[in-house]
């Protein structure tokens, strides 16, 4: 049926994205790349770009996708590639001198990149401004913003949530990639957030899993994910945050991903 076909299509996209991301990670050599937070978000990116309206024509009616946990560019760029906004040649320049595709994204609407990221928490406040402008123009498009759970340690996230509730920005949808890890280790050990669900609710946001009904308030999706999902030697390991792939480790990671999708 239609839903099963959609799931199969998304799984194929994720498979392609992960293999391409591993190629890109290998190409950085001793500089390394942010693998863990990208591989926890691959499914989020694949699903998001399958429903959002994005293009390279600067259309004011386009949806805005703001990546606040901006170090997950291996997922971001490969999603833009699957969407047709980037080509393989673009990806081959990843993090090299003169590239447009750095380890943190630089805003370039031609490539569908809406926001220059890097400083955690700023993406949500930027998204609030974009959503407010759309609201004042009576536009019906959406603003999607991706946060990390570790990123929710930032005070600016909670200031932004107050603004979202105050201005009743029902055109803004927050997705939290809750992989349980941040730079220095497990999020619960660094700064225990206890119940993110209750915190978001206290700011007047609606928690949901599917976007299938209208709402008068902003919504948040908390996605429980796995750091470096699918890569056996990096999963749920703080070393996955930013690491170097040797050729041997790259080959093992490819083997793991192929095994993960075997038969699908």
Each model region followed by its residue ranges:
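N-terminal capping segment at the start of a domain
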Residues: 14-31, 177-179
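Cofactor-binding active-site loop characterized by glycine-rich and histidine/acidic residues
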Residues: 28-29, 39-159, 165-166
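Generic beta-sheet signal
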Residues: 63-65, 141-145, 172, 217-225
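Short acidic, glycine/serine/threonine-rich loops at helix termini
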Residues: 77-79, 106, 156-158, 184-188, ...
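A short alpha/beta connector and helix-capping loop motif
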Residues: 154-179, 222-223
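Active-site pocket-lining segment
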Residues: 170-188, 197-204
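Glycine/aspartate-rich loop-and-adjacent alpha/beta segment that forms the canonical ThDP
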Residues: 199, 206, 215-264
